[in-house]
Regions:
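Class I SAM-dependent transferase core
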Residues: 1-58, 62, 91, 98-107
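Ubiquitous "structural anchor" signal
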Residues: 37, 55, 77-80, 153
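Class I SAM-dependent methyltransferase "Motif I" SAM/SAH-binding loop
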Residues: 65-68
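Residues at secondary-structure transition points
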Residues: 35, 71-73
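S-adenosylmethionine
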Residues: 74, 81-84, 88-189
Length: 189
C-alpha cells in the first residue's frame, strides 16, 4: 500500500481529510464511499496510485473534476506540490475548499467552481501536470486538459475499466493534439 510508505505527518493529514469528506458527505453527496475503510482503498490508494508519475514534474498541477477532492488533495499532501482543484458543481467546490481551509492546506491547494474550458480561457497553458480521475470519456478529457498544459507538461488519466475502442479513440485524439502516451499501467484494487 502506497499510503503506508508516507511519513506519519502526511498520513495523518490524508486521514483527517478523508474523515472530513465522510462527515461532509452526510449532508452533501461528494462520494458514494461512506466508510473510512472503503475510502482508504477506493479514494486514497487509488489517488496515490500515480504518485511516481505525479512527482516526475515540478510546478503547479490541476485536478479536473475533483468531486470530493480526489485525487488532488491526497497527491498534494503526499508530494508537497501546489495545485488547483476544479469542479463545475459550485457546492462541491465550496465544500472541498472549506475542508482544505479547516486542515490549513490553503497555502498549497486552491479550489475553484469552474469548468475546465472556462479556466483555459482565463489562465491558458499554466499547469505542469493535469490530472483527471473518472471524468468523461478519455477523448473528451484529453481535449479538456491539453489547453491547460505547459509545453512538455504531463497529463495523467486515472480511469476505471475502459473498453478497447475508447482507448484507441483516446490515442487517436492524443496524437492529433500533439500528445504522446509515455506509460500505461493497470491496477486492480
Amino acid at each position: 500500500m502506497i499510503f503506508e510508505t508516507l511519513d506519519t505527518d502526511k498520513q495523518k493529514k490524508i486521514q483527517a481529510y478523508l474523515d472530513l469528506v465522510i462527515e461532509k458527505n452526510k449532508e452533501l453527496k461528494l462520494t458514494r464511499i461512506e466508510t473510512r475503510e472503503k475510502g482508504m482503498l477506493l479514494h486514497i490508494e487509488d489517488s496515490l496510485s500515480c504518485i511516481d508519475e505525479f512527482t516526475s514534474q515540478d510546478g503547479p498541477f490541476l485536478d479536473i473534476g475533483t468531486g470530493g477532492g480526489f485525487p488532488g488533495v491526497p497527491l498534494a499532501i503526499a508530494s508537497g506540490r501546489t495545485g488547483v482543484l476544479i469542479d463545475s458543481v459550485q457546492k462541491k467546490a465550496r465544500a472541498v475548499q472549506e475542508m482544505i481551509d479547516e486542515l490549513n492546506l490553503s497555502n498549497m491547494i486552491q479550489v475553484r467552481g469552474i469548468r475546465s474550458e472556462e479556466l483555459a480561457l482565463e489562465v491558458g497553458e499554466k499547469f505542469h501536470t493535469v490530472i483527471a480521475r473518472a471524468v468523461s470519456s478519455l477523448p473528451t478529457v484529453l481535449e479538456l486538459a491539453t489547453p491547460l498544459l505547459v509545453s512538455h507538461g504531463e497529463f495523467i488519466a486515472l480511469r476505471g475499466k475502459e473498453d478497447e475502442r475508447s482507448i484507441e479513440e483516446g490515442n487517436r485524439i492524443a496524437k492529433k493534439l500533439g500528445l504522446e502516451m509515455i506509460s500505461s499501467k493497470h491496477l486492480y484494487i
